[in-house]
UniProtKB/Swiss-Prot annotation:
Spans annotated as N-terminal acylcarrier protein transacylase domain (SAT): 18-256
Gene: nscA
Product template (PT) domain, as annotated region: 1317-1636
Name of the protein this chain belongs to: Non-reducing polyketide synthase nscA
PKS/mFAS DH domain: residues covered: 1321-1631
Keywords of this entry: Acyltransferase, Multifunctional enzyme, Phosphopantetheine, Phosphoprotein, Transferase
Gene3D superfamilies associated with the record: 3.30.70.3290, 3.40.47.10, ACP-like (1.10.1200.10), Malonyl-Coenzyme A Acyl Carrier Protein, domain 2 (3.40.366.10), Polyketide synthase dehydratase (3.10.129.110)
SMART domains named in the record: PKS_AT, PKS_KS, PKS_PP
Organism: Arthroderma otae (strain ATCC MYA-4605 / CBS 113480)
Amino acid sequence: MDPTFPRVVFFSNEFPSDDLKDLFRRLHQQSKDRRFKLLSIFLEESTAILKDEVAKLPRPLKELVPPFDSVLALANVDFRQGPLGAAMESSMLTILELGMFIGHYEAEDAEWDLVPSRTVLAGLSIGILAAAAVALSSSLADVAKNGAEGVRVSFRLGVYVADISTKLESPQPDGTLSSWAHVVTETTQAGVQDELDQFNADTQSPELTKVFVSAADKTSVSVSGPPSRIKAAFQHSPALRYSKSLPLPVYDGLCHASHLYTQNDIDAVINSAESVIQPNRSVRLALLSSQTGKPFAARTARELFLEIGTELLTGTIYLDNVTAGIVEHFQLDSETSGKCQIDSFRTSLVLRGIYSTVEAKFTKEQQQLIRRDLVCWVHKDFGPRRPHSHASSKLAIVGMACRLPGGANDLDLFWKLLEEGRDTHTTVPPDRFDLNTHYDPTGKTENATQTPFGNFIDRPGYFDAGFFNMSPREAEQTDPMQRLALVTAYEAMEMAGVVPGRTPSTHPSRIGTFYGQASDDWRELNASQNISTYAVPGGERAFANGRINYFFKFSGPSFNLDTACSSGLAAVQAACSALWAGEADTVIAGGLNVITDPDNYCGLGNAHFLSKTGQCKVWDKDADGYCRADGIGSVVIKRLEDAEADNDNILAVVLGARTNHSAEAISITHPHAGAQRANYRQVLHQAGVNPVDVSYIELHGTGTQAGDAVESESVSDVFAPVTPRRRPDQRLYLGAVKSNIGHGEAAAGIASLLKALLVYQKNMIPMHIGIKSEINPTIPKDLERRNVGLAMENTPWPRPAGKKRLAVVNSFGAHGGNTTLLLEDAPERVKAQSTEDRITHPVLISAKSKKSLQANMESLLSYLDQHPETSLADLAYTTSSRRMHHSMRFGTAVSCIPALQKALRSQLCNPNFASEMRPIPNEAPSVVLAFTGQGAYYSGMGRELFIEFPYFRAQVQQLDRLAQRLGFPSVVPVIDGSIEDSPASPILTQLSVVILEIALARFWSLLGVSISAVIGHSLGEYAALAVAGVISAADALYLVGRRAQLVEERCTPGSHSMLSVRASEDAIQEMLASEPETAAIAYEVSCCNTYQDTVIGGLKDEINNIRMALEAKSIKCTLLDVPYAFHTAQMDSILDGLEALAMPVPFKAPSIPVLSPLLATAVFDVKSFNANYLRRATRETVDFAAAIEAAQDMGLVDTKTIWVDVGPHPICAGLVRGMIPSASVVSSCRRNEDSIATISKSLVTLHLAGLTPFWAEFFRPRECEYSLLHLPKYRWNETDYWIPYIGTWTLDKAHLKHGTKPTPFSLSMSRPSALRTSLVHQITAETVEATTATLHTISDMQHPDFLEAIHGHTMNKCGVATSSIWSDMAFTVGEYLYRRLVPNVKDVHMNLADVEVLHAQVAGKTKGSVQPLVLQAHLDLSTNSMSLAWFNADGETGECAAESFATATVRFEDPVAWKKEWARLTHLVRGRIEALEQRAAEGKASRLSKPLAYALFKNVVDYADRYRGMDSVVLDELEAMAEVTLVPERHGTWHTPPHWIDSVSHLAGLVMNGSDASNTRDYFFVTPGCDSFRLLNKLEPGVRYRSYVRMFPLPEDPNMHGGDVYILQGEEIVGMVGMIRFRRVPRLLMDRFFSPPTTTSVAGPAPPVAAATAKGHNVIPTTPAVPTPAPAIATSNPIVNSAIAYKTPESTPPLAPSSESSTPKESPIATPPESERADPMDNMVSQCLRLMARETGLEVEALTGDASFVQLGVDSLMSLVLSEKFRAELGVEIKSSLFLECPTIGEMTAWIEEYC
């Protein structure tokens, strides 16, 4: 392009109209080409800057952003409905425009042609930030670098604006997007401004929330403001209401608002200190202001971004000025060229206007306007792609763990072994195999080993199965390599301080596992002796690291590698490659080897790999092969920059890692020096390292003649060449760990790496012990001259000052592979200068069993005794923020190490410690925030939090700035304590309290406290309403401040007073009335805090008289130190003014329930809160006690609920405890106590109660000052799960022949079928004879049509098949078979009779799975009936269950008989319907609207819209009628759509589950079936039906109701459900009955408890009248069974817990707060026994140790009830199957003692 043209580059504030996802995909794809190098750099920088900014977000916002490794990943996520919508949209627009700009130049291979004298940049809104990056650039490379700053500022701007704007108006509770800006066309700015001024004045809108003009041009005006205010303004003004206007897609808040933002806000967004551009960088190109149309005056980058920030936040956009500025530029510079050019990113309405103006101007002057689109290039094909080079970050090893021979079960023991020069080889232990039978040194015995030696780890079978959620059976079948991979992975992560999700690099989706494994001994030998369920997952190699990913919920890559002897180090190299490729951010890698199989010994011996004389003799002249070894090792690796950002301890740095192959070797197993040399050089070149700078090499060193000779040659040639020779001070030391611990095969490389890491840590190279006689003569003779040699004694390896030591680790595979790692020292960490002033620190310890918790506590105590200098701050940081927390917990907040030691000793010395120890509950308790009133005010409240926590400080400052913009004084001096604690004005007092409380609530949210409800006491209710989203924070501040002003103006301070009385309202009245001198005294009840704590108010003298009178009666009274008496007549003078102020304020439905002390209830709706509510709340009584009681009655709170007192001092805490004595209450601040200490104690309490706070956020402000301590590792509760190899069958098989196995059954559902509907999918068998027919069909409940029908009826958030589904299937099959026998029949009328459903069918939640069921039908014309049975089937084998889950009979009948029967009943039914209508009109029966009726249904079942056919209902106890209209859509292929059947019949379910006559709080009602179901004609959509039912108790079963449902069309009965039955079921069993299936096997025999479905409310358990013994089966869900239950093998005895045994299948996971723990003398066993006695009706004395549950009548239903009661009342989470695994009282109590 000719640079002489005058040019404008226009950056829009709108995305191009193209498919945005496609644009970003193309941009991403093009960036991979070497041609677009600068584009690639820009996108990488933008990704990095966004990662950095996201990492700085508060955790609640951070969690909204999925892990991403490119901007493309973010472009595919819809953020619009969340609080990050503006931030993401702004930054992505900036990235897109700058990316297109850079790519355009690279695509054209064009020179930078933006000449400052002839180029002007322009943009609107966010587009100016992209333009700024170009304005600061003098080359395209500069744009790539500077663009990241534009991205940073645009993201920060979006976050900041959204945060401020939510304080002006809360988002809609349902997430609906509302526009903050409307455009009005065909009007003038002055006209619109007049209308807005009038609206703002009339409504007395606060300045902050006024509606204003944000942009204007000659044809349109943009109006901005809070959405509700804009709506009100347009309704208020006829001119606006009838104008042409449209909402703009501005959903995240306000910009261009000079009344809202100040310089502080601009500085907060720009934050020049974090800029990636030098602040004094010069502005190179003119950039036009969108406000003035003139170039910004800024000369430097800092000035430019500040000016832009000012314009974006406070300036009005005037598009006409921008256009004029562009025209002026062209006019000044177009005369010489005759041409001008506008570059843009596609076109837009704004740009077309600019084109039009420019062309109109220049046409007269015969000038040419050139338009250039900078987006077109991205769609071009540039030929074959040439990729960029790979990433080259350094990598950091941050954690390691091992199980190695010689008892080296941890790193300290491993180092001790090396330091002492120990040789660990022994003969093969008997638990592996018997040398007496399997060892033959002559080699004559087939399959016998010729060497008896090896190196073995201790106790390979020991494992903590309960910790890893494995049953004893699964643990036993699982390869010890897999088990120890889990264990060492955990220990390595523990050392590394990895807490999944704590940082971006440790997000579970970004963590991968890579393990090397080269043998399957356990699967092939030990476990194969009795192959069981877990044979495949327990033995196949892929499950070794797959199990790690699954247990820890990592979704990054999972690879198991086999490269023979180098597998372990090759896995590390593959892991490093994944980090360099960006496939993961954290990797866990290692090698695994546990020897058990003599076959491998034999094979290796016969191939001459193994030494017959003992250990590996590395570099010894008598080297004769290697000695086999066990080994398990794991390391944790990250990119160096991530490790540093995460504050990790770095053990060493990986500079390079490579693997190649010895392709030119003389044989596949022979090493090749040339290949080894090539691999070393590749690694050195990768890192840019001089080989002579390497000072230590850990050799592969197997002790074979060929291997040692070749490796010594390759190492000396590369690392110690003859020339250039090493200097004397450049000694190269060599070592080989195999001489100590043998050759671990797949674990050999990881063992070598662990040794090298320890060498770095200890600054010592341990002695080499491989040379037993003399050095191998094949080793090069000139090694010493080359300054190379083995470390024959322990040799210091000091780190030279200012330099880093380099080391190499080798590992070679017998198949020819060579792997090499290059390491260097970790960066020297300069710990930030501590400004630590926290006086109290939380220290936490946890475990998954009592034994482990106690051992962990003992370990820490021992560590502290040995390390008294330990920093408490570091210890708190390590145990809280850098640990995964488990169900058994100990925690305390202490101020010094001795205090911690004392607390630990106190607990450990407590003889009742084990019995008192309780796991946390499976579900975290609910949390209610209680906001205090103004009585707790003092200067410096929250001071330490304000100083210490930037987030809290920012919240306070933002709220304070809003208050100041509203005309109120700053409260910061009150918060930070810079003003004296003296009487302050009501305005300052009340505003500071409300600001503190709102900031505290958000701080608690930052710390991970999820809020279930809020309650506010008096003034605190304003904060509660703001936090619940009812009013905005700005409106809360406005109302509180203006209310305080009204009080000051209209009330006299000191004329009234308030008195707190420790007595009830009635008691006060009675005592005062009993005395003549006090009987007439006037007072009012201001607050009913508890039923024994009342606040009264009135005239000062009269209140004083009351105080003296009550104190004379020994009643405690406290005169409150307040100048005014709120909630009394003194407030009358302000009420009208307050209500008027609140009238314009928008009130929204609360996002969380609000407990209202005024209404004494919990509020969920949008109508309860309004201006009148605030008036009443100021004047009327604060009934705090009644609000809490209502919350209890409604089930919102219970004894386990945690209450957080939010305010300056815990006043509400005492009130809550007064109502709920056992309540756990924590504080936010406390007078005369450091607020960080208060928060620390509260967080510990919450942690122990079952919440897991975001400890990382608590330590985040000072994280760089803390060090991660290397504390003792987790103490496992281990049991030996070893399957010994029995016999000599590995020898015997040499003489046996092998057979074959049959091919497994294959199920196919893809064949054509003569009958196929939405529910009946395929005929599998059909037989038709003269008068009989049989049909078998199969259906998949996961088929979309079937699944959608099921999900139309959900219970407990699970789709449950309604019996209308079985009805349609019965009618479908019935008509099909009947027509097969009677082909010419016109209509088939069917009576579906004797329906009995034994098991509920719950839709599974596993995507891609099948959930088949089989329907078997047999029709007999001689009886005109058809029997039906439904069965579950196995999804893999097709095997049908032995027993059906439902049965029914279809009778083919004459409808004439039905009409006659119903004609006799019609007048009775119509009479009852009319009577119900009359009672409803008289108010004696309830008339329910459609929404209310189905809202009542939601107590048990949630129907989809298509099922909601009832338009209205009249309900009178157990009788009801409904008007019904069926939806027109059939939604599938059916005989009779299930949603139509349900709509006309489920009235019975509503009666049972929604009537006041039913106890729906404790029970729900479900149906096991009905006697008949008939329809005279097919149901029709649009026709109005009526349903009627009257339910009644059945005399034969007190828990059962029955009734007939009549279906009427007009005045005639057209259908009937005869005797539909409903059974009453305890509500606490809801989870048991209605949970998705978890397995895919065929169900075994049904237990005596069953769940069934039918019309109305469709699922029920049925139990025998007499309890029967539970059958000996164990299912994952013994009630709801979708063909999903495993039989317990008869040979497997029930678990018998003991101190020696492992955890049974279900371990409890629960730990309530300390305040709820049982008395030590009243231990858990006695509590459980009492509960069992109560529930079974037995005496406690009958529950003896040898009594069996079968004998006691505890059947499967009772076991379910007991397990739920244990959970609900005792906090113990066990499943009912435990009653089978522990069949006697004695076994059960032993289990409880150990695990509860």
